[in-house]
């Protein structure tokens, strides 16, 4: 059951006029450097959320326009790239960039160079859509934890209906783990500062973590330990290649898109987060569109659940403006805030927020080009 926290909207105070315990304006907190770990210090507490733009060139190679697009946003503390597919059958949307060929790696080098030239940092978000793929993209089977189809049609290609996937074998799961690790190494070769594992929003890793999409009875299903196994194997394999301090993961303990949640899912995420606490990750990034949503089986907001169960860096997201984000950080609800659509509409988002200038409202028509 999902409900809106309407009272929070009513009770938010103007953070620009509020003072922290140290006597500084709350908004100043957002613009101070933030130390993720011994390896990475960010210029500020803003992150650019991963935003699928479907603008890759032939061969799913990043373009010069993409390099310029990310470069214009390099003042954000950490950019997380649009989701990047780790192998051909990972694709579920048209023209989404890959990170499994040398041409793709070389294309991303232009992107990372554009960001680094302006002093920024950028992670690649590693992605496999699982049952949300379609043979149209790769002329191969659709693979998932279990043979449970997603109802509906493929976004931006509504003539394509989702198909019943084939359940992965354990040998195929082992290969996927290695493919994630290879993508992580490719990201470092391409100049990324690290990677974010996409384990949220109903895609492949998330499908293993929810009972509605994981009906397995082998080593990857049936109990919290087994249902968490794939996610942890991916984390460990990538960390072994590039270092855990350069690895973040995005999670959706509250199922809100592409799959259904159930009370039994709570035990899976309790177990998973306990194990992630033992690993030196850069951060966990909440996956949700609106952090006012609450989930009965989590006891409230997904962000509050993650804060209570994970001791490392937490990235909040979900319809936050700078003032609400600053207040939430001051209240220790999370450590950094990811901004999504406002950064599509405002490449100069950080400058405008600093100056208190009005932001250009986001509109879907803006998705037609990279500005």
Range-by-range predicted roles:
Residues 4, 10, 19-371:
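Flavin-dependent oxidoreductase catalytic cores
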């Amino acid at each position: 059951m999902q409900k809106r926290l309407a009272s929070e909207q009513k009770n938010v105070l103007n953070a620009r006029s509020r003072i922290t315990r140290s006597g500084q304006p709350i908004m100043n907190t957002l613009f101070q450097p933030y130390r993720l770990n011994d390896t990475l210090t960010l210029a500020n507490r803003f992150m650019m959320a991963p935003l699928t733009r479907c603008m890759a060139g032939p061969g799913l190679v990043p373009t010069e326009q993409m390099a310029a697009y990310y470069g214009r946003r390099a003042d954000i503390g950490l950019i997380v790239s649009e989701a990047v597919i780790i192998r051909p059958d990972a694709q579920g949307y048209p023209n989404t960039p890959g990170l499994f060929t040398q041409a793709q790696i070389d294309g991303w080098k232009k992107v990372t160079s554009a960001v680094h030239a302006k002093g920024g940092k950028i992670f690649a978000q590693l992605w496999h859509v699982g049952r949300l793929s379609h043979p149209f993209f790769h002329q191969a089977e659709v693979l998932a934890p279990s043979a449970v189809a997603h109802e509906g049609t493929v976004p931006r290609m509504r003539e394509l209906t989702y198909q019943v996937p084939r359940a992965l074998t354990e040998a195929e799961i082992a290969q996927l783990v290695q493919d994630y690790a290879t993508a992580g190494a490719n990201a470092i070769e391409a100049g990324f500062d690290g990677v974010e594992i996409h384990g949220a929003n109903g895609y492949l890793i998330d499908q293993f973590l929810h009972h509605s999409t994981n009906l397995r009875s082998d080593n990857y299903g049936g109990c919290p330990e087994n249902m968490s196994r794939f996610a942890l194997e991916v984390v460990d394999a990538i960390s072994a290649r590039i270092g855990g301090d350069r690895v973040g993961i995005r999670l959706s303990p509250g199922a809100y898109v592409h799959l259904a949640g159930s009370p039994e899912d709570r035990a899976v995420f309790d177990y998973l987060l306990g194990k992630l606490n033992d690993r030196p990750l850069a951060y966990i990034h909440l996956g949700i569109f609106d952090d006012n949503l609450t989930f009965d089986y989590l006891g409230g907001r997904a962000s509050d659940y993650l804060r209570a169960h994970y001791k490392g860096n937490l990235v909040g997201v979900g319809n936050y403006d700078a003032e609400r984000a600053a207040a939430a950080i001051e209240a220790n609800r999370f450590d950094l805030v990811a901004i999504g659509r406002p950064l599509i509409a405002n490449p100069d988002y950080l400058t405008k927020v600093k100056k208190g200038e009005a932001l250009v409202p986001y509109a879907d028509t803006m998705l037609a080009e990279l500005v």
